[in-house]
Amino acid sequence: MSDERCALVLEGGAMRGMYTAGVLDCFMDYDISFDAVIGVSAGALFGVNLLSKQRGRVIRYNKRFNSDKNYMGIRPLLREKNIVSTKYAYDTVPRELDPFDDEEYKKSDIPFYAVVTNIRTGKPEYVQIKSVFEQMDV
């Protein structure tokens, strides 16, 4: 019996994460799993789809909504002071337009951690995400 364990760490990097999304799809194609998954920024946003078993979702919604003025651009920048609309990206898209399967995600026995920065200390913290919809603000 082996005590070896293997975790997957997913980097951030905005649209550079599209390469990561393709690798995650490949992992799903070949049924490759890990003992834990850790993601920061885009790695966290894209990595949850591995546990929800939603192959192709990241690439699909980024291609579909990338040119949507409500999703990314000057409109969200003026309204929310963010180049990407957090309401649209984290609420409208995953709940209505390209649904995220939070129930399938919660069934996974693989723990998923989002890396966040403690604004008081500047140090990283690792938050286990048990429900994407319930912990979206992380």
Segments predicted by a language model, with ranges:
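Patatin-like phospholipase
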Residues: 1-40, 48-138
